[in-house]
Amino acid sequence: VYAQAGMADREAEKPIERNTIFRLYSMTKPITAVAAMILMERGMLDLYEPVADILPAFAHQKVERDGKLYTPERPILMHDLLAMTSGLVYPEEQTMGGRAVTKVSEEACARLESDHPVSTQEMAEKIAACPLVFAPGTSWQYVGKPAAGNAAVDRTGRVYLCKFYAEMCGT
């Protein structure tokens, strides 16, 4: 659509206009993917590199299977983080990994307004300690890319993710 089409509010019969504002969700995922592709193009990132080579906290990942924890056959690769095949999961109550991520998320939210909010690095380390819900590369699950973003930032030596994204986007 190169102009405008449809209704902004069907009940009120209000049409979409050129300046209609929309909420956009999950936009850090494509931005992180573009940043990773730029780093790959510059020779600074290998998509098939183990994440643990960049973020050591991911070196000892475990996979939950039948209520027990196992060492996966292979590590999480950068490609897995971007393709959502890492085994990482959003907060939920059905799996051991999901419950662990729920606790991490609750702590991060509780500390948000404190003097010690959870840093991106700390969040990646805490997520790395959570069990995976499947072995890397064996399945797909919609999940965010904070670890991928943190790995990209770590690889470039940048400290602040927002600054890195702004530089990657040319702003």
Predicted regions and their residues:
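A short, well-structured edge-of-sheet supersecondary motif
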Residues: V1-P15, L47-E49, S114-P117, A128, ...
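Short, solvent-exposed loop/turn and secondary-structure capping segments
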Residues: Y2-Q4, E92-G97
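Short glycine/proline-rich turn/loop motifs
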Residues: A12-R18, V104-A108, E125-F134
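Active-site helix/loop module of the DD-peptidase/beta-lactamase fold
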Residues: R18, R23-M27, L39-E93, A129, ...
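Short amphipathic alpha-helical face segments that pack within enzyme cores
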Residues: P30-A35, G144-A152, E167
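Alpha-helix-centered segments that form part of catalytic cores
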Residues: M78-L82, R111-A135
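Amphipathic alpha-helical interface segments
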Residues: M96-S114
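Cytochrome P450
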Residues: T138-G144
